[in-house]
């Protein structure tokens, strides 16, 4: 080892060695990418997150977890199954990165698929997938290395090995993240047998159904619709031959869902439906569909308008909250839909105007005094302010945040989308009454998305405090506001 005495060095040499030492010290002390202060850019944000948001439990009031997998306390065989199976966010990114379909939904081996994902990850920088990927590795598996082709094998092996232990089964993951309530997405004809199994064998997280009756609206596909009505009739234990029969069957199932703990409905719609109609023509449209006759587009819209009102009336009778997810245009790639089916990454943002129909729909319910708690979600960011003002047109003082703008959804479930949603809600309503985040996910690994949202929320408020837009003297209230948005508001609002 060469030892140089300071007196033998020139000043420029000393400067050089000093800079080298600084660089070495910097590298040795460099925080991992996912660290305690990830996305928190000032002291106020850090205080709000670490003292308030970080400690709150989770209510995941809208997700697409499979109830059977929860009931069975499913154990995943490897990282590919738990991370890439059914995740159309990742599939879209892989396709965009030039990965052949055989490595995405095809028959290639598990590690081959994972390797292609690892090759894609560096190219997802500035896409939320980059943040989600590394948050999930850190929080779930304790892995702080960045995923790329050089680290793929080691990360795959380490995480897959951990998945073989009891601590990484589905129920254990939910307990680890202190998930108090999960609401799955369920059709009226579903038996809810796995919800009952979970209820009879509790593990610490309430797993409740959500009423999602979209299939009961699809009269434009009479052959499929007839089969669905048969399934619904069997579940309800009655014949369905008229529109009134349909409502009676749905009400029976609605009652059953309520008995099983359901307190939320959800509707995935291109737009609100609010056409004028007569009940005689709705019954005729329904009977014709059962005979295999395809309705006109005008008849489709009238039928949807009628049944959507009836769904909302049922929800009001039981005091449920109803959710409307507006603005998706689905299954746009016909060739790939024919191969892979729905929910495989071929949906997009629609641009249909929603203000007139939305106001007309909600006004009909308000005029009947049958407008229950309602959350409005838009997929097109142009509709943030539209739905925020729509919601506050129908609040009636009976419940804080009774009608409100929902969190950034699907393509807007990212930093910019969340900030724009919260800014619209803040500007045109009450952010403090917001029921907060949901995963909307099919994966047991998605709970760090609640952390992601909370960090964005705290940084948004922290920046306002730093810039003098919020009073520092009100820190106690702002801390409580963060706790409420993270958990308390949802607990009070949904009354699970």
Where are these predicted regions, by residue range?
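Metal-cofactor-binding active-site regions of metalloenzymes
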Residues: 15-318, 370-372, 376-388, 392-496
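Hard-cation-handling environments
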Residues: 328, 333
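Divalent-cation-assisted or electrostatically stabilized phosphate/pyrophosphate-binding catalytic cores
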Residues: 351-358
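Metal/cofactor-centered catalytic core regions of large enzymes
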Residues: 299, 345-348
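C-terminal amphipathic alpha-helical interaction region
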Residues: 322-324
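Short, positively charged and aromatic/hydrophobic N-terminal segments
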Residues: 1-10, 19-22
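Short, basic/hydrophobic alpha-helical segments
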Residues: 361-367
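Short glycine/proline- and charge-enriched loop/turn segments
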Residues: 337-345
